[in-house]
Amino acid sequence: MAKNKKQNGKAKTPPVVAAAAGEQKETIGNGHAEQNGLNGHASSEESDPAAAGPNESADDKSAGVAGGGETEQQQQQQEDDVMRLMQETGFTVQVLSPGVEPLSIQVSSMELVQEIHQLLMDREDTCHRTCFSLQLDGRTLDNFAELKNIDGLQEGSVIRVVEEPYTMREARIHVRHVRDLLKSLDPADAYNGVDCSSLTFLHTITMGDIMEKKKTRQESVDCTPPDFIMPGARERPLLPLQPGTGKKGTPQPLKVLTTSAWNPPPGPRKLHGDLMYLYVVTMEDKRLHISACSRGFYVNQSTDDAFNPQPANPSYLSHSLIDLLSQISATFRRCFAQMQKKRTQRHPFERVATPYQVYTWTAPALEHTIDAIRAEDTFSSKLGYEEHIPGQTRDWNEELQTTRELPRATLPERLLRERAIFKVHSDFVTAATRGAMAVIDGNVMPINPGEDAKTQMFIWNNIFFSLGFDVRDHYKELGGDAAAFVAPRNDLHGVRVYSAVDVEGLYTLGTVVIDYRGYRVTAQSIIPGILEREQDQSVVYGSIDFGKTVLSHPKYLELLNAAGKHLKILPHSVYNDKEEAIELCSSVECKGIIGNDGRHYILDLLRTFPPDVNFLALPAEEEAVGKESRAMGFPIEHRHKLCCLRQELLEAFVENRYLMFMKHAAVQLQQCVKMKQEQKAAAAQKTEEGGKQAAIEAAAPAEGDKTPAKDAKDGKEAGKDANDGKEEGSTTKEAAAAAAAARSVPKPDSEDAKKLVESLISSDQKNESMEVVKRACEAVGSLKEYEFNIRFNPDVYSPGIRHVDEEPNAAGSLRRQKQLVKDAAEFLVKHQIPSFVHECLDHTSAPMDGVTLTELLHNRGINVRYLGKVVDQLAKIKQLEYLHTIAVSELIVRAAKHLFTAYLQQTDVMSMAAAISHFLNCFLTVSTGGYQPVANGTGADGDGQLADEFGPKAGGKKQNKQSKRGGGGGGGKGAAGGGRKATFSVPSSDNCEWTALTSKTLWAQIRQELKAYWDFELTVEQPAKEGKESKAAVIDSIEPLIGAFKLQKISLLRSFCLKTGVQILLQEYAFEQRNRPAFTDADIVNVFPVVKHINPRASDAYNFYTTGQTKIQQGYLQDGYGLISEALNLLNNVYGAMHPENAQCLRMLARLSYIMGDPQEALAIQQRAVLMSERVNGVDHPYTISEYGHLALYCFANSQITTALKLLYRARYLATIVCGENHPDIALMDSNISLILHAVGEYELSLRFLEHALALNIRYYGEKSLKVAVSYHLVARTQSCMGDFRSALVNEKETYAIYKQQLGENHEKTQESSECLRHLTQQAVVLQKKMNYANGKLLSTGLPPIHIQPPSMGSVLDMLNAINGIIFVQISSKEIANFKNEIEKRQKEAGAQSQQPGGGPVQANQEEVDQMLMETMQKTAAGIPFEEQDGEKKDGAAEAASHTAGGAAANTAAPAVSPRRKS
C-alpha cells in the first residue's frame, strides 16, 4: 500500500488520473466475498494471462513492478527488506524440562519467548504444564520479548523450564488446559461452532497422512466406486458428507472433571494457600475432591456432604493435575497416553484454530456430557479471566485504532502492524458474535430498558449492539424497516473501503453485522466519550437529519478528500437550512465525530457509493435510465432507497471511460499533426470532425450510448458527434471486442498514459492540443474541462438535499454529475452483464453454487439484485444451462431466506425447532395442511413433547381457523418483515401464525418476493396436450420446478441452511414421502449466526503474490516459485497458519512444484492446501472440491492409485451434493476417474465415466470442440482395450473429423488420430480373422484370448496432465531439435563445452532457456495437448526429440527447470 502511494505521488498527470487504477489493487480485494488475485480462486496462472481484467496487461498485474525505473528500485528495495527479514533466521537452543529428555528446537530471532512457551504446551511430553517460566542462566525471560533482544541467547544456549507457584488465575487456566487436552480429539466443538474449531475429513478418506503411505502396486488396487458416485445415480445420500462419524472414538479417561460445589475456599483455607476445589469421578468410579493450592494439586478428604480440606492418605502433591490423576487412576493413565499419541499424530492443520468460526450445516446426534467449564463459559461473568490481559474487559476501540497507528515505513514494521490489525480484528469478530447471540438470547441488559424491544440498544464487553429496525422513523423516507435492515450491510461496505484506503488520521469503527434467529444485529466499537453527550453535540461534520442541518470541518474535508481520490468520490457543496453552502466530500449522512481521544472518526457510511438509478423511482423529468436499461425493464422501484453501485463497477467504468478518452485524444492529435503538415487551413475543421467521428466509433463497442444525452440537446458539436457515433446492441460479441480493444491502451495510471497526456499538453500546437483534450474530456463526461476527472457525487439523487449548482453548463455541473451516475448504471446493464455471460461461456471459472456465483458477479461490480436479469440472459444460452440452474436456485433460496427472517421473528422460542422444520417441509416437500406435530418413537424427542405441552395447540380447530386467516400475509414483505412482533427475546406463547403455513402459501409468497425484489417471474410451462396450447403450471410446491429448472432438493437444502445458519441432523431425508413430513423438530440441531465483517489484508504478501504470478505468466517458473513462497511466509507472518489466502498460495506452490518436475513436493504441499481449505472454507465448499481434484492428480503421479481414486470419488460426491451432475467440472472429474480406472484395467467402469464426460463436454463446448475430440479419443481407447474395435473405430473417426476441421489435415494431432485409426482398423481385421478361424476350426475350444497391451502409467499420467490443463510445454520433435541446436549454438558462441546428445537436456543459461520455452509455449497448438502412446515414455527433452515413432507430440517437462521423472 505504502509503495503504491509513493508511486502515485510522482504522477505529473492530473492526480485523479494517477489514482484511477493504482489503488484498485489495494481497495478492491477487501470485501467479504473474496476477490481476484490472491483472494479469488481461479488464479491467473490457471486461467489466462489477462485474467486480471480485460484492460489489465500482465505487466500491470505485478503491482507496479514494471512501471519504470523508480518503481523497479522500490520493488528491489522491498525484496531486499524481505531477504533481510528472512535472513534473521534460526538457531538451535536446548530446552530442559523436569523429568523429560532435553529437547533441541530451532527458533528464529524474530520469535517471541511466548512461542517457545506455546510449543511446550503443545508437545506430547510437556503439554501437561502451563504454569512455568523459562530461564536462561538463572534469569527469567519476559514472555513478550523477541529472542533477538535477549542478552546471551545464542546457538546452543540452554533454556530451563522452572515450575512457578500457582495463582487463582493460573490454576483456572491449568484446569481449562487439562480439560481441553481431554477433549482435544472430540469433534463436538467443531459441530457446535465454538473456539474456532472446524471439521476436516481428508485423513479419514485417505486413512492417514498421505506422505507416510507406501506406493500401491497395480494389482492391489480396490477401486469400485460406491453406487451413488456412478454417473446417473439418482440418490444423493447425506451421510457420506461426514465420513467416520459413527465410529467409536478413543476410550474416555475420566467420567467427570468439574469445579466442586465447595468453592470458593473459606477464609481460613485461603490462608493455607487453597485456591479452588475440583470434583473428579474416575472410570473406576472413585469420587474424589481435589484441592488446588499454590504448590499444585492434591486429593483432600471432603465428600459430597462433608467438607474436610485435609490431604487424603496417602497424599500426593503434584504440580500438574495430569500427574495427580495418573497416580490416582490406572485407566486415566492408560487412556491419556493413548489420547496423547493420537493427538500428536494428527496433522497440525487439523488442530490449529481458524481465524474466524466456520459453521457446519449438518451434525450427527452428539452426546451431551457434564462439563462445568463449558457451563461457566456460557455466562458472561467469566469475561474477566478469559482475556489474558489485565482489566475486566478489552477496550476494543483503543486496540483497533492503536494497531492502525503503528509505523509502516519498512517491511518488518508493516508485517508487525498488519499482524496486530488482523489479530485484534479476528478477536473482535469473535467477541461481537458472542455478544450478538447473547443479545438475541436475552442474556444482556439493554441500556434503554424502558423502551420498546425493537428500539433497545445494548453494551456488552465494550461493544455497542443495535437491531436492524427503523427506530424513531429514522429511515421513514428511505423505506422504513427494509432500509434499516440493509443499512448496516451498506455501512460495512463503507468501512471496508475506507479501511482499505487507510488514510492516516481517518478512523472507522470496528463493525460486524450478525444475522441470528431472524434478527440483524450491528456490533460496533465505541467512540470514547460518545455516550456522555447527545449525538447532535458530538457531530462536527455531516448531517444527523438527512440534510436539514449540515456541518463541515476543515480537517475532515482534508482527510475525506484524500480518501475520495481513491474511492472516486466527488467533493460537492449543499445548502443547509440557513441557505449556507456547505462543502462535503462524502454523502450527507456520513458523520464526523472527534472522540475524547482526539481521533477523527467517521460513521454511518451507508451511502459511500453513488445510488443505482436502475432501482430508484425518480421523477419523470429526470429521465433516469438509458434506452438499454429501459428495454430490460428498468427502473424497478426497490423496497428501499439505499441501492448503491459497487466499488468494482466504478473502477471498471472509470477505466472504460479512460480508454475512450485516450483513443479520442490520440485520434484527434494525429489529425492535428496531419493537418499541420498538409497546411490545408480550409479543410482543418472538417478533418477534426472526421477524426472526432472516428474516435467515437473506435470507442463505441466498448462504450455504447453513454455520452451525455443532454449535451446533444444543447447543440454541442461533441455531443452530437458522440451520439451519432454510438452503436446499439449489447451482444456478447461486442463485449468481447471491447475487451480486445482495451488491451492496447495504457491504464489510467501507467507510465505510457502519463507520457501520452504530457505530450498532448506540451506539444508544439499548444492551442490545438488543449482543444483536443477539452473535446476528449467532454466526450467522456469528465467533470473538468481540461483534465480527465471522473468522480461520483453520492448525494445527486438523495431526497431533500439541495445542491449548489452555480454554473449549470460548466463541466462540473450537477447535470453532468447526474449523467455520470446514470451512465455508470447503464454501463452495468449494457456492458458488465453481457461480458459476464460471455466470460462464462469458456467455463474456466465455472461457479458451483450461489456463493461462488455471487463472488463472480461482485468481482464484475454486478449487485445480486440484478440476478433476475442475469438469469434471463442465461436462459437464452443452451451451453450455460448449468449456470442457469445455479442462478435460479440462488434466487429461490434468497427469496425463501427473506421470508424465513420474518417468519422466525414471529415464532416463540419454545417452538423454534418445530417452526424451522415446518418451514423446511413447506419449502422442500409438498405440505398441504398446517403444522402437524410428529411423535417420534425415540426418547430423545423431549422438546417435541414440550412443544406439544406448552406450545401452539395446532390440534385445536378454533385456533387453527384464526391462524389460517392471519397466515400467509405476514411474510410477504420479506426482509422488511410485515407484522413483526414487538418483542424479540420471547414472543408471547400464543404466537403461532407459523403453524398455518402450507407449501401453497409459502410458494405464493416466494413468487411474490422474486417479482418484487428481482423482477423475476417464476413460471413453468406445462407440456401441451393434444390440440391444446401449453399453459403455465400452477406452482404451489417445489415439485413443478425440479424438472423445469433441473433443481436438486439437497442442493437447495444445503444452500438454505448455509444462508440462514440452520444446522440439521446428519441423516437421510425422505423428501418424497407423502404420509410423513421429511423434517421433524428433532432434526433441527442448532441455529448459528451468519457473520459479515471486513477482511484486513496482508498487502506486502499480496504484492509478492501478484509479482510471482506475472513471472509465471512470462515463463520464469523458478522465480515465480520463489516469490510465491515468499508471499506464503509473509501470509503466515500476518494471518498465522490458517487462512483462505494461505490455502490459495499453497495450491499455487503445489502446482508449480508439479510442473517443475517434483510431484512428491507437490503432493506434500497440496495435502496442506486441502486440509486448510476444509478448515477455513468448509468441507463441502467448491474451493475444497477443486483442491481434492488437484491432490488426486498428484497422488496418481506418486503411484498412490487407490488414494487418488478415493479423493476423486470424494470430490465427485461433494460436487453432486453442491450442484448435481450437470456441470463442466463434473466432466473433468469423470475424465480423471475414467483414466485412472483405465490404468488399473477396470475398462467397463472407466467407459461409464467417460461416456458421461463426453456427453457433458458436447453439451458445454459444442460438438466440434477440441475437448470433445479428446473425449471421443479416450472412449475409443477404452473400447479398443475391451476388444470392441468396431465402436472404437466409430469414436476415433469423430476425433479425426474434429481435428481435421479445427486444426487442418497436416497438424500433428490430426496425423496422430489418423495413425490411431489405421492401428484400430488393423486390430479389428486381426480380431475378425481370429474369430473366423475359431468359428471354422476350433469350435470346441472357444475363442483364443485377445492380446491387448494395457496402457503404461506414464501415458495415463500424460493424458491426466493434459486434460487438467497442465502443460509441461508441448514441443514437437522438430522444435526440440531446433531448440537443442539453438542452445548448442549459443553455448559454442560462449565457448562452453557442449554435452553429448542423448545425455538429457543441455545446460544453458536459465534466462535464455526460459525465454525460449516461453516462445515455444506461445506456439502451443489450440490448447489440448495429449499423447496417445501405449509404450513407456522416454525421459528428457533430448530423448523425446529422437522418439518420433507414431508422430506423437512429446509432453516434456520444461527442460531448464528439471525434466519430469518417469512414473
Swiss-Prot record:
Top-level taxon: Eukaryota
Keyword Transmembrane helix listed: no
Q: Where is the composition biased (Basic residues)?
A: 955-964
Compositionally skewed regions (Gly residues) per UniProt: 965-980
Q: Does the keyword Ribosomal protein apply?
A: no
Q: State a single Gene Ontology molecular function.
A: mRNA binding
Residue intervals passing through the bilayer: none
Q: What does this protein do?
A: mRNA-binding protein involved in proper cytoplasmic distribution of mitochondria.
Q: What is this protein called?
A: Clustered mitochondria protein homolog
**What organism, scientifically named, is this protein from?**
Anopheles gambiae
Q: What is the lineage of its organism?
A: Eukaryota, Metazoa, Ecdysozoa, Arthropoda, Hexapoda
